[in-house]
A protein has these predicted regions:
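Ser/Thr-glycine-rich phosphate-binding loops at phosphate-binding pockets of nucleotides
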Residues: 35, 74, 103
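SDR active-site strand-loop-helix element
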Residues: 3, 28-32, 69-75, 81, ...
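Hydrophobic, aromatic-enriched interface-forming segments
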Residues: 128-133
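NAD(P)H-binding glycine-rich loop region in Rossmannoid oxidoreductase-like domains
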Residues: 10-52, 61-63
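Catalytic helix-loop patch of NAD(P)-dependent Rossmann-fold dehydrogenases
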Residues: 42, 49, 53-57, 77-120, ...
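A short beta-strand-loop structural module common to alpha/beta enzyme folds
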Residues: 1-8
Length: 133
């Protein structure tokens, strides 16, 4: 079941528990995120609400129904290295430079609180439109 933005406010932990508990999915793939990188510096609370605290709520809800949580993260967890010629590896040390990258790294940590999790680090996602799937 692909939920559009209007189907679940991931920053509302009660709604997250309700929807996950009702649907009882085998897996949850969280593609939702605060992606306004520059705005994250001036609105860190809103950024953290979506990229960290919402992931913690998803992890708790997934634990409640024994669902796999797949958390989509970002290459921003690594920061910037203008001299780097190779892609990052999963065991490279993160070092975010800004609030957006730090919030995505914190979201990864939140996902790891549930043993049945996977983290996918990517540099971008797209869909058919801004309204969701």
């Amino acid at each position: 079941v692909a939920l559009p933005r209007s189907g679940l406010d991931i920053t509302d932990p009660v709604a997250v528990d309700d929807v996950i508990g009702r649907l009882r999915p085998r897996a949850v793939i969280n593609c939702a995120a605060w992606t306004a990188v520059d705005k994250a510096e001036t609105e860190p609370r809103a950024c953290r609400a979506a990229n960290e605290h919402a992931v913690a709520a998803l992890a708790r809800a997934c634990r409640g129904v024994d669902a796999l949580l797949v958390q989509v993260s970002s290459d921003y967890v690594f920061g910037a290295d203008a001299t780097r010629k190779l892609p990052y590896r999963e065991d490279d040390s993160p070092g975010p430079l800004g609030e957006y990258g730090a919030s995505k790294l914190a979201g990864e940590a939140a996902a790891r609180t549930w043993e049945r999790h996977q983290v996918v680090r990517t540099c971008g996602l797209y869909s058919a439109g801004a309204a969701g799937p």
